Each structure stands twice: as structure tokens, then as C-alpha cells.
Amino acid sequence: MGEVIWNKETYNELIVNLKNNADEKYRDFTLNLNPGKEKIIGIRIPELRKKATEISKGDWRKFLDISYKNDNGYIEEEFIRGLVIGNVKNCDIEEFIDYVDDFIGRIDSWSVNDTFCSSLKITKKNMDRMHTFILDNLKSKNPWRKRFSIVMLMDYYLSEEYLDEIFDICDTIKDDEYYYKMAVAWLLSMCFVKFRDRTMAYFTSCNLDDFTYNKALQKTRESLRVSKEDKEILKEMKRKTVKM
């Protein structure tokens, strides 16, 4: 089979193919995980990843252009676009960042965001440039850009070199959006797993709001890589909040 020539017709054929392979149970599962997302076909991520890998070997730029212009609103379309970008090999880092920047400006789902972040393996070969890009997005008023940055820090920068910076970011970059706060809590739970003593010290003197702080402790306690003793200590560290 030759390379697909992407146009409105071939893109619609892709959507029909996805619908023909829909899993209703998985669709219901995905609906529950993504409040506000009604248009879901029901395709598992490994299958979407296979599609994206095939597309990225061809004219992926044309595919992205056509897919944006002919978007049907399905979450699977967002997943595929993100995974295609994550798979590209034949572009320089600045062009890559342009595509990433455009994509994250359209994100409105935590699952799309987090799957996208995990696919950006090119980050490992461009740590400094991507680090700058991540910090730039933390300045945005868009909470999804901030979540992108937090998850990227967790996926690629969770090391001794960046730990103090991560703590500082969690203390100083604020946003009332639920999915941003939950990303910060998740990041800090992973910090605890890798750097127990320094993260414990951070928890005792941090500047987190009560919700994010308590969620960070909760997510840390839920980890299978945290000892029973530490879970008890963390339980006692929970802040008591007054319900209004």
C-alpha cells in the first residue's frame, strides 16, 4: 500500500475506519474520565498510537493541516494529532516547537495533554531548548499551557539538577484551575518517590494552597513506592481546612 495523500476525502476515510473499530465499553470509560467531552468514538490509545506512527512516516505536515481544517470534534482526532507530532523525526527543533505550541494552544483535556507530553521523546535530545519553552508556557494565563509545563517537568526533568526549580515553580506559579492544581500534586508525589528527604523538607515549609498541598500528600500516600511509615507521617501532615 502506497503513502496516503491527505485531503478531505482520505481524512474522512480515517474517521470512518476509526468508527468501524469503536469499542463501546471503552467509549463509556473515556467519557467518564473526560467530563465535558461528549464526542468520543472509543479507540484505545495503543491503536491510536499505531495510526499516528504510520501517519508520521508520510506527509505528516499535510495531515495536520487537513485534520485541523476537517476536524469532527472527536477526542481521538486530538490524540492522533498529538501523537503524530510526538513521532516526527524529519524537522528541526524550532519547527517542532512551533507545532507543539500550536497544539497545546488547543488543548482542553487532561488526558490529551498528558498523552501528548509522554510522546514528546525529542525532548531528551533538546533538554535546554525545551526547558526554555516549558518555562515560557508557565507564564501563560492559559491553565492548560501550565499543566503542559508541569507534566513535561515530571516526564523529563525530574532529576537532582532541576529539583529546586520544580519546588520553586510549585510554590510561585499559581492557578485556580482544578487540572493545573492536580498536575502540581502529581508532580510533587513523584518528587517524593525519587527524592524522599528533600520533598519531605519541602512539604514542611512550602507555599502551596491547602487544596494542592493536601492533594499532593494524598497522591503521595496512594503510591505503591512509598513506605507505610511515610504514609502515616504524611497522613498526620494534612492541613485541616474549614468548610464555608
Language-model region placement:
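Alpha-helical scaffold domains
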Residues: 1-244
